[in-house]
């Protein structure tokens, strides 16, 4: 059984990881 809090936590981590990846990529390409 997956709780809403776990889903919310996973989504937040994925969002932060995506933002960090985009910022890192843009920094490398500059």
Curated annotation (Swiss-Prot):
Keywords: Chloroplast, Membrane, Photosynthesis, Photosystem I, Plastid, Thylakoid, Transmembrane, Transmembrane helix
Name of a matching Pfam family: PsaM
Highest taxon of the lineage: Eukaryota
InterPro entries hit by this protein: PSI_PsaM, PSI_PsaM_sf
Membrane spanning residue stretches: 7-29
Recorded GO CC terms: chloroplast thylakoid membrane; photosystem I
Major subcellular site: plastid
Membrane topology value: Single-pass membrane protein
Localization terms from the record: Plastid, Chloroplast thylakoid membrane
Biological processes annotated in GO: photosynthesis
Recorded family membership: Belongs to the PsaM family.
Record protein name field: Photosystem I reaction center subunit XII
Species the sequence originates in: Phaeodactylum tricornutum (strain CCAP 1055/1)
């Amino acid at each position: 059984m997956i709780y809403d809090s776990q889903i919310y936590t996973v989504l937040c981590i994925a969002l932060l990881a995506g933002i960090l990846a985009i910022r890192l990529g843009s920094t490398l390409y500059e």
